[in-house]
């Protein structure tokens, strides 16, 4: 069987209801730069959403870079993750991390929610 590493629409949290579901009773995992809120879903696959505020990451290009790298990391780890809904919250200082360090931080966080 060939494993797909695509990132289709059904792997994203899109509606306010989906976000509210996670914010209601989240399981938290944190580092100094990122907090992951997670909650088991009824689907057979994980989904991801972002809440990266302008207050914590001033410039749009930094927010976009963080989301792009996080999406890519999620895409590569999706088959090892439990069927949960994830919301990524960025803290102050995350924009100072280079790509390798950010990937290492995300790797550590994904391990907490893998099979």
From Swiss-Prot:
Protein name (record): Ribonuclease P protein component
Gene3D superfamilies named among the record's database cross-references: 3.30.230.10
Quaternary structure note: Consists of a catalytic RNA component (M1 or rnpB) and a protein subunit.
Stated family: Belongs to the RnpA family.
GO cellular component: ribonuclease P complex
Coiled coil: none
Function: RNaseP catalyzes the removal of the 5'-leader sequence from pre-tRNA to produce the mature 5'-terminus. It can also cleave other RNA substrates such as 4.5S RNA. The protein component plays an auxiliary but essential role in vivo by binding to the 5'-leader sequence and broadening the substrate specificity of the ribozyme.
Encoding gene per record: rnpA
């Amino acid at each position: 069987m060939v494993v797909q590493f695509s990132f289709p629409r059904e792997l994203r949290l899109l509606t306010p209801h989906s976000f509210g579901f996670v914010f209601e009773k989240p399981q938290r995992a944190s580092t100094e730069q990122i907090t992951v809120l997670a909650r088991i879903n009824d689907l057979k696959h994980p989904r991801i959403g972002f809440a990266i505020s302008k207050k914590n990451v001033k410039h749009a290009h930094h927010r976009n870079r963080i989301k792009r790298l996080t999406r890519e990391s999620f895409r590569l780890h999706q088959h090892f993750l439990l069927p949960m809904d994830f919301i990524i919250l960025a803290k102050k200082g995350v924009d100072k991390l280079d790509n390798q360090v950010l990937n290492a931080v995300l790797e550590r966080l994904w391990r907490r929610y893998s099979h």
